[in-house]
């Protein structure tokens, strides 16, 4: 398969661009990772998991009396913004603190750890029980509502976001000869 772009390897060209433009790369990574993962979360019932329709849940929280369309559009906007903000936080703060090794595998591991452990736990421990289902007593990750499948789905969703984020936000080492 020919993956050449302008005489350079397309994957390497992307990594050079990411390294030279960390903020722009984080924004793009957040947009793309967020959209892909959000679609997969909505399609989770296809593999026997509960749907994670974060845009609808977010929109219903923002405007509980709005129509389905208003809730979805508002939720998609704010959920998409969340995905971008968390990608920026990852790229600018967490990524540099998680070690100096910047191989594709290590970059992927960093993103998966960040998204699954930190973001997944925030979602399961706080957002789902105290924001999206406030007052229903559903417990950690909705364990009293959807059982283990809902908790698993929350962590699976965040792992998928991390995989997408790590695949896209994949810089080179700052001393890489390609950067000169």
Residue ranges of each PLM-predicted region?
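Juxtamembrane/disordered regions of integral membrane proteins
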Residues: 2-180
């Amino acid at each position: 398969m020919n993956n050449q772009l302008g005489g350079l390897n397309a994957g390497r060209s992307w990594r050079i661009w990411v390294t030279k433009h960390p903020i722009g790369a984080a924004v793009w990574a957040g947009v793309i990772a967020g959209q892909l993962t959000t679609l997969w979360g909505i399609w989770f019932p296809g593999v026997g998991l509960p749907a994670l329709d974060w845009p609808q849940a977010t929109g219903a929280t923002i405007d509980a009396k709005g129509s389905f369309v208003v809730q979805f559009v508002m939720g998609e906007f704010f959920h998409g913004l969340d995905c971008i903000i968390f990608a920026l936080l990852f790229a600018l703060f967490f990524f540099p603190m998680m070690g100096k090794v910047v191989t594709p595998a290590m970059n992927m591991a960093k993103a998966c750890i960040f998204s699954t452990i930190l973001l997944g736990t925030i979602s399961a421990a706080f957002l789902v029980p105290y924001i999206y289902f406030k007052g229903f007593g559903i417990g950690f990750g909705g364990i009293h509502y959807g059982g283990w499948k809902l908790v698993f789905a929350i962590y699976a969703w965040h792992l998928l976001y991390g995989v997408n984020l790590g695949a896209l936000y994949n810089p080179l080492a700052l001393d890489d000869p390609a950067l000169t």
